[in-house]
């Protein structure tokens, strides 16, 4: 047939049996990739430290998606929350991976069967005997079934009525666990950070899908609409399906990048806006302030800050700090976090507390500037020492640590003070192991960043695909010069004007 690579899909254009076969094979590939990727991630994942080396620091991509749907245990005897388990059951991480691979194999066999047995009676119109699909009826069937699945997920899986529930956490990603969720039917259900909205929206959308599916199964489209939207053409199905997919891809790119109840920070890492707004820093200071109000010392108040909360307040966990083309996990960038050194408090020789100005997200380097409580610059690490007025040496800056491994330790020698001032630009200070993975010290993005970039890119690509195929199906007669209602068999190339026997070509 000699088709160029970008035209090969025409072979299934008028062949419903093999069109079904290639779609089943596509499902086999998707499910097979998911299962294989899960097994690979399980082979390299280290579950030993869920606080300082969580899945998102290790670059896990499919494990977070399994976890948010209620999978927490492994046949290896470990739990994602750090404990050990004796009876993980069939729906463990390995169980889900295995079921996807098994499903992939069955789809592979089904695809081969449908490719071989393509000429089934169900695909032919009994009136004409030609291959034919009742596309509006198929649309109704698919809408009904997807509505049923959507309703079932919201009403049973998410609510825990028949299923585990979903991953739910507090606003600071500290207490996450899988638990049943009650539907939120009030206005709070529209808050993207309220898990109850996931249940209620799936129930509502599923109900709508079931009713719409039944409608399309029982009501035929008007003839004008059928012809106007080219409902008899399979390319119309392709175009509208691409539209649904790119719309969904844009939505999930948004919920992932900006954060929502569906993308918990314990599973996918923090968002860049939490660094930009000092989200975790404010909560840490609030907790310290509450401790001081209870007559705790600074050391006691800072020692009560969870290491997990302090770790979120570190720029290396900001997904926007990794370049788009820096491959690898966060751990292979700045290293594996080993421990929190504590919170450094800087003071000048007059006893004023100084605060290091933090590095904004899109800077690679940033001047080290220390300001007092009123925002007045009191010290810095100058670029040109000859003209310096606020250098650490001149101002007499010292640093003392509260909480963490260096609790109670203070330094006054300028070199050490400057070292910790530079590190304080990046948020809370952590000891990082760069030797184990040969980490190069260059920040990487988290799975949150990769997911967003991938889905936004493919959404844009699919948007153009929708326009392309929509235009092809709506203007097929214009592009091809063929009347879409032409029923007679015509021989391409026999006439100068297609289908007009008065313009028969002369044999050369």
Curated annotation (Swiss-Prot):
Cellular component annotations (GO), alphabetically ordered: chloroplast thylakoid membrane; photosystem II
Keywords in alphabetical order: Chlorophyll, Chloroplast, Chromophore, Membrane, Photosynthesis, Photosystem II, Plastid, Thylakoid, Transmembrane, Transmembrane helix
UniProt-listed InterPro entries: PS_antenna-like, PS_II_antenna-like_sf, PSII_PsbB
Protein topology in the membrane: Multi-pass membrane protein
SUPFAM superfamilies, per database record: Photosystem II antenna protein-like
Signal peptide interval: none
Subcellular location, record wording: Plastid, Chloroplast thylakoid membrane
GO biological process, one term: photosynthetic electron transport in photosystem II
Gene3D superfamilies: Photosystem II CP47 reaction center protein
Pfam families (UniProt xref): PSII
Entry's Gene Ontology molecular function annotations: chlorophyll binding; electron transporter, transferring electrons within the cyclic electron transport pathway of photosynthesis activity
Cofactor binding: number and manner: Binds multiple chlorophylls. PSII binds additional chlorophylls, carotenoids and specific lipids.
Record's subunit section: PSII is composed of 1 copy each of membrane proteins PsbA, PsbB, PsbC, PsbD, PsbE, PsbF, PsbH, PsbI, PsbJ, PsbK, PsbL, PsbM, PsbT, PsbX, PsbY, PsbZ, Psb30/Ycf12, at least 3 peripheral proteins of the oxygen-evolving complex and a large number of cofactors. It forms dimeric complexes.
Function: One of the components of the core complex of photosystem II (PSII). It binds chlorophyll and helps catalyze the primary light-induced photochemical processes of PSII. PSII is a light-driven water:plastoquinone oxidoreductase, using light energy to abstract electrons from H(2)O, generating O(2) and a proton gradient subsequently used for ATP formation.
Family, as annotated: Belongs to the PsbB/PsbC family. PsbB subfamily.
Protein name from the UniProt record: Photosystem II CP47 reaction center protein
Highest classification ranks of the organism: Eukaryota, Viridiplantae, Streptophyta, Embryophyta, Tracheophyta
